[in-house]
């Protein structure tokens, strides 16, 4: 037995059950992924014990020479990975990364243009329940009704009308390529700063499979998990002219001591992302997404914007008898994990929704390929055709478990 199993069997058992879920269920939540053993080892290291307020070479605590090495490695690797002038790897999350940029550029009450959460944006892009919507004057932009892609004409019209101090670009449920150059061109007409939140697509950007926002934005924020496949956390890239102000808005602005064990794990993940095989892996994520999208369409499902260019897709259930909530719960019983998600112009509440969001990063990490995605589409269809049939859902779960056992990832942790 492990030390944890001996001392706290309740926590140890919950961890084991979650390991089994990640190993044998099909994880299709677009924002989730599975880290490598190297990342996990760094995350669970003795660096968790070290306070290191400040930055490398300028700490408020002694004994930081070793963690300075780690943070400098993370910074330099991040800059190399994305071609950025400056990187701050201390944000605990993507939301805190975004908050730091807001506070670097804006004063309370300033006007910000951000993507409507209901159209695929993020809470931190101006939702009224979030700090961004409470502290700043938010003007939302969205997608067109015709093809559910970003309405760049609306972006320009709203920008010229409201003259925002900052334009926030990026999304949490948008399946198409984003034209960062178009946002830059519009922003320059009113002297606005551009912040791109590339949390969902950072891995694709690193691999050259999605245009990079770095040349077009003063600030680029991201999480370090999702497609990037690192530990849970955040990061900010910016132009050198903003480095000092940005750093001070992270510490002491909104955070105290950085999580050095998480920063070590980020450094490891960035090294993994710099390796040639990472591009192959990201290519497979996109191939799998396109194959799954095609498979779902073949099964009769409707996708917003008609498909996907990246790692995710949004299934539109508005013309069926299902809600996103019912679909999520049924799929969970079938061993398939997705999340209910609003679709553009949704008439249902965010707690019910008319869609589900599906992504391929975690399944790709397990080793699934395009042919498996066709099988996944059939499994999803079978489950959603039998949402009230517990026997059928259990049968689908058996098929899911059998498939996933062919693609072990953490099986050694269950031995």
Curated annotation (Swiss-Prot):
The record marks 225 as: Plays an important role in substrate specificity. Keywords: Amino-acid biosynthesis, Cytoplasm, One-carbon metabolism, Pyridoxal phosphate, Transferase. Its cofactor is pyridoxal 5'-phosphate. The modification N6-(pyridoxal phosphate)lysine is found at residue 226. InterPro entries: PyrdxlP-dep_Trfase, PyrdxlP-dep_Trfase_major, PyrdxlP-dep_Trfase_small, Ser_HO-MeTrfase, Ser_HO-MeTrfase-like, Ser_HO-MeTrfase_PLP_BS, SHMT-like_dom. GO terms for cellular component: cytosol. This is Serine hydroxymethyltransferase. It comes from Geotalea uraniireducens (strain Rf4). The gene is glyA.
